[in-house]
């Protein structure tokens, strides 16, 4: 699987494009090549070698979701699919994703849901969530089935903080796939992490110890 230039066709201009080619030479735009269209780390469509696009229900850009789509649309046989690898990039094997609870809100979504893929099936289960305002995480939310109060925090919305919270509060040992939501630019996020590294750890730990 190879990363291509941004897709220029259909209703997803400038979305990231990856091609899955059935041979080892990556011949480019030949008959049989499949293009996976990704926007904000979600698979939103796929295209054939003619550039014809086919919308899909948005799902996190992970190896297992690529497998699901390949089975759905009969792209390749099982043996070929089982050996798909990222060339020049890493495919995520995580079972966990963080996405806006309501897609109608887009980038202004105030609630992001942590979900876990169940038994490598299309279904997912709710694990918890984050309330977000102005790119700040303001509250960590638990499922109603868990006898645990929500926890108020004041943390920058960065990939690093998201994964720290997932580890401390939800015992998740996999990297969270953030999709459907645009995080602050990486340069800014890195600067924030360096500046607040100690205070963020203290805040997460203290809030965790004081939960009730």
UniProtKB/Swiss-Prot annotation:
GO biological process: symbiont-mediated suppression of host innate immune response
Coiled-coil ranges (or none): none
Domain of life: Viruses
Protein's UniProt keywords contain NAD: no
Pfam families in alphabetical order: AdfA
Keywords: Host-virus interaction, Inhibition of host innate immune response by virus, Viral immunoevasion
Function: Plays a role in counteracting the host DarT defense system, when mutated at Arg-164.
Similarity section: Belongs to the Anti-DarT factor A family.
Protein name: Anti-DarT factor A
Species: Escherichia phage RB69 (Bacteriophage RB69)
């Amino acid at each position: 699987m190879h990363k291509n230039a941004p897709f220029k066709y259909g209703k997803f201009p400038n979305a990231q494009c990856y091609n899955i080619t059935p041979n080892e030479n990556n011949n480019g735009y030949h008959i049989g090549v499949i293009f996976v269209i990704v926007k904000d780390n979600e698979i939103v469509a796929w295209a054939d070698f003619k550039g014809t696009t086919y919308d899909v229900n948005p799902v996190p850009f992970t190896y297992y979701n690529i497998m699901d789509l390949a089975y759905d649309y009969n792209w390749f046989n099982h043996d070929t699919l089982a050996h798909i690898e990222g060339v020049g990039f890493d495919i995520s094997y995580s079972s966990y994703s963080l996405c806006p609870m309501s897609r109608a809100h887009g980038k202004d979504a105030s609630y992001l849901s942590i979900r876990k893929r169940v038994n490598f099936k299309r279904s997912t289960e709710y694990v918890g969530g984050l309330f977000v305002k102005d790119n700040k995480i303001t509250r960590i939310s638990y499922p109603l089935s868990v006898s645990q109060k929500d926890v108020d925090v004041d943390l920058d919305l960065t990939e690093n903080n998201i994964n720290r919270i997932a580890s401390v509060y939800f015992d998740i040992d996999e990297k969270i796939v953030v999709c459907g939501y645009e995080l602050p630019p990486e340069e800014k996020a890195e600067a924030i992490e360096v500046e607040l590294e100690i205070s963020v750890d203290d805040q997460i730990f203290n809030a965790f110890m004081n939960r009730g």
